Regions:
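Positively charged n-region of N-terminal signal peptides that target proteins for export
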Residues: 1-4
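PEST-like low-complexity, intrinsically disordered acidic/proline/serine-rich tracts
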Residues: 18-275
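Bacterial N-terminal signal peptides
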Residues: 6-16
Length: 275
């Protein structure tokens, strides 16, 4: 079964009226915003409260483009007008040429088709949803993903600094160091390889990529996400993108594996837990 984007999964579930995780994601948001949940020590809680269930589901956009830019894309990150490609981000000349090639080629060289997991902000656009869990025992945050082969990210919260590229390199998820700035979780990552795509639509990057992500929860049902992309070999300057993600109350992140889908067709469709 072909991998379906989040928007398609939500539409199918809504039309069918089924009681699935995707259907929950399409449910109406509460008319009155609920307060941001917190741990007993006052720190923002990004996961469900004790005894509750839920996860972060649908993002407000389907791909990356620089903050303030207005471009039309479909759920896969394909531009409605290829002439808009140079406006998406401040590309170096070689990078915009590669981005346009990938767009014109219908994203056929997307590594996810060969079961190579996405990384960086693209994780937040994969079907299946995600959770952000605090681990005070080991002073870490874990970001668990239902899609993208059920990967997880480990964010070190023990005060360590992001390593230099010569110290850590060639990884898919990077070395991730986090800290709190008020109620905002700030995660700095580096040490990436260039074999994955960090966005739907095929934005290029090199091993010089550094990401600064900012997670905040202004109310119970909203996650605000901001990412600054810094890769001087690919872009002429650092640039920032942002979007929001909706909370799916009472659901569980979906199960999705890709081990048996190495035929170039892409991962199979995720299913709800227990199906």
């Amino acid at each position: 079964m072909r991998y379906l984007p989040v928007a398609a999964l939500l539409l199918v579930a809504a039309l069918a009226g089924c009681d699935s995780a995707s259907d929950s994601a399409s449910a109406a948001r509460p008319e009155v915003s609920r307060p941001t949940p917190r741990y007993p020590d006052g720190q923002v809680r990004f996961d469900s409260e004790p005894g509750g269930r839920g996860y972060w589901g649908r993002a407000s956009v389907s791909s990356l483009f620089e903050k303030g830019v207005q471009v039309a894309m479909d759920e896969k990150g394909l531009l409605a007008n290829i002439a808009d490609a140079p406006r998406v981000a401040p590309f170096q000349p070689w990078a915009v040429a590669l981005y346009e090639y990938r767009q014109r080629n219908g994203l056929k060289d997307d590594p996810i088709r060969a079961c190579i997991a996405p990384s960086g902000p693209r994780h937040l656009h994969t079907a299946g949803g995600f959770r952000i869990i605090r681990d005070p025992t080991y002073d870490r945050m874990y970001i668990l993903f239902g899609g993208g082969n059920r990967n997880w990210r480990v964010v070190f919260m023990d005060g360590r600094e992001p390593p230099n590229p010569e110290e850590v390199s060639g990884t898919y998820f990077g070395h991730q160091a986090g800290r709190w700035e008020g109620d905002t979780l700030v995660v700095e990552s580096s040490g990436y390889n260039a074999r994955f795509w960090f966005s739907n639509g095929g934005l290029p990057h090199t091993e010089a990529l550094r990401l600064t992500e900012r997670f905040s929860r202004p109310d119970f049902d909203t996650l605000k996400y901001e990412v600054t992309v810094d890769d001087p070999l690919t872009y002429t300057r650092p640039w920032t993108a942002e979007w929001t993600v909706d909370w799916v109350d009472g659901g569980e992140i979906a199960e999705q594996f890709c081990e048996d889908r190495r035929d170039g067709l892409g991962p199979s469709e995720p299913t709800s837990a227990g199906e």
